[in-house]
Amino acid sequence: MVRRRAQEVSAVTDQPACPPAMDLAPASGSRGLHVITWGCQMNVYDSARMTDVLRPLGYHPVDTPDTADMVILNTCHIRDRAAEKVFSELGRLRLVKEARATEGQQTVLAVAGCVAQAEGKEILARAPFVDIVLGPQTYHRLPEMVARAARAAGAVIDTDFPAEQKFDFLPDAQAPQSPGGITSFLTIQEGCDKFCSFCVVPYTRGAEASRPVASVLREARRMVECGAREITLLGQNVNAYHGEGPDGRVWGLARLAEALAAIPGLARIRYTTSHPRDMDADLIAAHRDLPALMPFLHLPVQSGSDRILDAMNRGHTAADYRDLVLRLRDARPDIALSSDFIVGHPGETDADFEATLQLIRDVGFAQAFSFKYSPRPGTPAAGAPLQVAEDVKDARLQALQALLRTQQDAFNDGTVGHVVPVLFTGHGRKAGQLSGRSPYLQPVHVEGPDSLIGQIANVEIRERYTNSLSGTLVQERAFA
């Protein structure tokens, strides 16, 4: 049986009004901005920040590229054939740009994100109609790039890793990233120093860098003032956070989480993505001591084979991961885990794959993401010998996902008949239905009053579906 806490720390119902700067209605004569976002939660956050930094230039969000004076395509380099997907989308946007040009309207087209960082020159060679190419570390320079693009005959490209940190120059966040602002993402760390053999992140996002504590707390308070009840802290390697604190010392993620938990109105804190090597004793203790820190942790392991973990340059063994899980569960018995797995890394044998399946059986995951290995140009694994055949990778992925699906179903089954605190974020698909999330990020649907949106209330889970739960309210009002 899955153990549950029936209540969480819940903030006062009355939230302070969102500051006047949040008046985001477009001014007369303003210009439309359409942002297309692919990839991770950090890209969602980055897109919001690019929107913020362009507001002083008169740009406001619009729903379609056809009505936009500027279009930003914020890209992701993680998936296979990521660059080709970008060029396909750029072909569509070229038609939009040309159609607007026939009507005497200009469209500034920008490509941002990790594909822009990795393929900047190739983008301009194959898509010369693109006006701006910028990497993830130069968003604070976007207004300057727009001005340069207006003056220049050619495109502007900025994919440097500048000495200054962009967060020192970006304005405070202006808009939440979800309808109603009940949940928000907050980037606190970027880059990675681990150099896993399969991963492009160190090359596209750069070295690990952390925002100062004061900057993080200021933005978090603003999010809460604007209605956020839950904040997810983001970073490529978020538990490596080492920001400068107001006391002049370096703060780790545990100390930052403690400070965030003290913000009135912030009921839930999450963080992603973590590396096992940076899950220190202080952070484990924070899961024990901070009720606002949700008992659901995404902790990628990638493989259960020590030989493959070494080939991946993960810096830990399968036994290290198992021991870490035991320490987490000892500190927080109700914690649940999700993870990432890659099948078919170069050199992976049947025995290596079986070791991964055994680790999954031993640990037990509430959720997981799994992928076939695909080479990323410039990474060590791309040129490694003993590449695994595609049909073998397909079979292994199918077997692994079947095991993970069984575990996810079992975890969700364990909630049926139990009372779970649910943060309601909006309406469900059916009339009179509300939708929210459990502490374990499970979607939960109930019938209830709109007054519960933005609040936490107890729900008795009655039924489990493939990817969601349904139940009935135990109480008709939020608890404090």
Swiss-Prot record:
[4Fe-4S] cluster 1 binds at C40, C76, C114. Belongs to the methylthiotransferase family. MiaB subfamily. Keywords: 4Fe-4S, Cytoplasm, Iron, Iron-sulfur, Metal-binding, S-adenosyl-L-methionine, Transferase, tRNA processing. GO terms for cellular component: cytosol. Gene3D superfamilies: Methylthiotransferase, N-terminal domain, tm_1862 like domain. It catalyses: N(6)-dimethylallyladenosine(37) in tRNA + (sulfur carrier)-SH + AH2 + 2 S-adenosyl-L-methionine = 2-methylsulfanyl-N(6)-dimethylallyladenosine(37) in tRNA + (sulfur carrier)-H + 5'-deoxyadenosine + L-methionine + A + S-adenosyl-L-homocysteine + 2 H(+). It comes from Gluconacetobacter diazotrophicus (strain ATCC 49037 / DSM 5601 / CCUG 37298 / CIP 103539 / LMG 7603 / PAl5). The keyword tRNA processing applies. Its EC number is 2.8.4.3. InterPro entries: Elp3/MiaA/NifB-like_rSAM, Methylthiotransferase, Methylthiotransferase_CS, Methylthiotransferase_N, Methylthiotransferase_N_sf, MiaB_methiolase, rSAM, rSAM_horseshoe. [4Fe-4S] cluster 2 binds at C192, C196, C199. Monomer. Residues 413-475 form the TRAM domain. Its cofactor is [4Fe-4S] cluster. Catalyzes the methylthiolation of N6-(dimethylallyl)adenosine (i(6)A), leading to the formation of 2-methylthio-N6-(dimethylallyl)adenosine (ms(2)i(6)A) at position 37 in tRNAs that read codons beginning with uridine. The lineage of its organism: Bacteria, Pseudomonadati, Pseudomonadota, Alphaproteobacteria, Acetobacterales. Residues 31-151 form the MTTase N-terminal domain. It is found in: Cytoplasm. The keyword Iron-sulfur applies. Residues 178-410 form the Radical SAM core domain. Binds 2 [4Fe-4S] clusters. One cluster is coordinated with 3 cysteines and an exchangeable S-adenosyl-L-methionine. GO terms for molecular function: 4 iron, 4 sulfur cluster binding; metal ion binding; N6-isopentenyladenosine methylthiotransferase activity. This is tRNA-2-methylthio-N(6)-dimethylallyladenosine synthase.
